Amino acid sequence: MWKIPRDFFSFFKKTSARVNIFPRSAPALLTRTGKKSYDDICAGTAGREKGFCIMKEKLSARDYVSVASMLFGLFFGAGNLIFPVHMGQMAGANLWPAIAGFCITGVGLPLLGVAALGLSRSSGLFDLSSKVGRPYAYFFTCLLYLTIGPFFAIPRCANTSFTVGLEQILPQDGNMKLWLFLFTLAFFIAALLFSLYPGKILTWVGKILNPLFLLFLGILVAVSLLNPTAHMSQVAPQGDYVSQPFFTGFLDGYNTMDALASLAFGIIVVQVIRGLGVEEPGAVARCTAKSGVFSCLLMAVIYLAVAVVGVQSRGVLETSENGGIALAQIARYYLGTPGLLVLAATVTLACLKTAIGLITSCAETFAAIFPHGPKYSAWAVIFSGVSLLFANFGLSAIIQYSIPVLMFLYPLAIMLPLLALCGKLFGHDRRVYGWTLGFTLAAALLDALFALPAGMQSLFHAGAIQKVVLRILPFSGLGLGWICPALVGLCIGLALHFCGKKPA
């Protein structure tokens, strides 16, 4: 999913736009310049004018390709493929509106987050969310990192590896939970060791792994498309995909968590673009958007192809409990046991690399925003232990319990970059941020409540509350009840900005 360099979080602190460390995730760009820092590049061919680089308005074609490749590598990962394949099995004949909704949240919103970081000149997520207030910045930053870290995304990496690989070749007896524990224990010991003692082997694995995985995926997709077991029109949609395919796909795109990741790690891309000489915020945002067109199109094509494979598998396979099982069953059907083993090994290594990056980045973040708390190594051990605990609940449980949290976080992760992109219109007035996100947060809490598992809903009397909310709040039946409250909060904030007393 996300490749996070350990030295990235030097950007996280409030520094000038010209930081002296480049992310390791852009080695090609550094190799081209032969430099190690932004200042070194500025002192080179461009020269200096009163301590600043001569700024460019746009990148060269070669630079656009480099940044686009970086964006693709930052957001695309093996773990995300379990969602479009399962969506394909569920959506059936209604795949087209479903994949359109999925791509908006799974592809478009991550690009929005990166562009917002570039346009607002923020030095990272904490700086961006501080526009609301420091207490909110601590709350939102911690919750977001815990979500894409030890609570859900990291355990999901281990579980996806187990579900696609070892679970498919082990005897289906009563010892599966023991095997899951042993596998996840080994997985997180390896992830922790690499997080504490990173080496060049990860860079080498990444360079080999991504092309290998894409090649294998291309073979699987090609074989499946050329030998469909069912045509799309013959596959009946299931669940909410029957009546609301677009909005159901839109909400299923939350599961990729890439919009959250864009706010956490998008500053990497922004700093690389600035390092190439594009400094004006609007130009940075434009360059990000242009670079993102290629990466977004590629991700959308991959998601679509995998979703179609999911649909066409329904001729011989039942709808699976989760996408990890579906992907493994499809690989076994078309490519046999050898193909399944190759898929399992590739996915396991890819997910391990993702888990290492996430443990590293979460530990760096918490060590940075809580300087008087535990050190980096202690946070890494804590997050690895928590991830091990949650991983043993199983992949389906992790996905199920992540949904309410994502229903709460995503509206905030949508509105914050939108406000940052439009911030010039209201001078980035904190009142606009506060009122908008305050109303959004309150409504998102209701959406999260209604997305809880059935047993927990009865505990909080969610059914009775939902009946009232459905009558008074538009779009709440679609899981988008936050939209109107967000607009109300925005109107109040803008009214205070343009008509009220200016803040001191």
Regions found by a protein language model. Give the residues of each.
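TM-loop-TM module centered on a large, flexible mid-protein loop between adjacent transmembrane helices
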Residues: 124-130, 302-352, 359, 368, ...
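Hydrophobic, small-residue-rich membrane helices and short re-entrant helix-turn-helix hairpins
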Residues: 197-208, 246, 269-298, 316-328, ...
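Membrane-interface loop-to-helix entry segments
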Residues: 196-224, 402-414, 433-443
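A generic transmembrane alpha-helix motif of multi-pass inner-membrane proteins
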Residues: 227, 429-504
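Hydrophobic alpha-helical segments and their helix-loop junctions in multi-pass secondary transporters
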Residues: 150, 154, 214-241, 259-260, ...
